[in-house]
């Protein structure tokens, strides 16, 4: 905020605060991706997409097939903190289930 001195009828000198508008830019967004491997069952990938990314069965199946055919698929686009949390949750779940499924994030 800028401060300037002003003279008012009631006071000899007063301080007036002026609000400076700040341009806010939207936060950077990140894609959360699943990477294909030869060992993780397709049904497990569908379950991950439903549980952690709130996808319906049909959408989850389409994403899983994209991962299978193209080597990677986008699960969703989120702010950095949410994307990082989802990557950690999915990676931990896959590890605990004994699957090598990889989940990563990259700037959108």
Curated annotation (Swiss-Prot):
GO terms for biological process: protein catabolic process; proteolysis. InterPro entries: ClpS (IPR022935), ClpS_core (IPR003769), Ribosomal_bL12_C/ClpS-like (IPR014719). SUPFAM superfamilies: ClpS-like. It holds the Pfam family ClpS. Signal peptide: none annotated. NCBIfam families: PRK00033.1-5 (NF000672). Binds to the N-terminal domain of the chaperone ClpA. Belongs to the ClpS family. PANTHER family: ATP-DEPENDENT CLP PROTEASE ADAPTER PROTEIN CLPS (PTHR33473:SF19), ATP-DEPENDENT CLP PROTEASE ADAPTER PROTEIN CLPS1, CHLOROPLASTIC (PTHR33473). Involved in the modulation of the specificity of the ClpAP-mediated ATP-dependent protein degradation. This is ATP-dependent Clp protease adapter protein ClpS.
């Amino acid at each position: 905020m800028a401060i300037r001195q002003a003279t008012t009828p009631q006071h000899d000198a007063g301080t007036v605060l002026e609000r400076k508008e700040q341009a806010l830019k939207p936060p950077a967004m990140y894609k959360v991706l699943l990477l294909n491997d030869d060992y993780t069952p397709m049904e497990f990938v569908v379950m991950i997409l439903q549980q952690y990314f709130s996808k319906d069965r049909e959408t989850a199946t389409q994403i899983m097939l994209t991962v299978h055919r193209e080597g990677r698929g986008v699960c969703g686009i989120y702010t950095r903190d949410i994307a990082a949390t989802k990557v950690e949750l999915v990676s931990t779940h896959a590890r605990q289930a004994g699957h090598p499924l990889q989940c990563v994030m990259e700037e959108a």
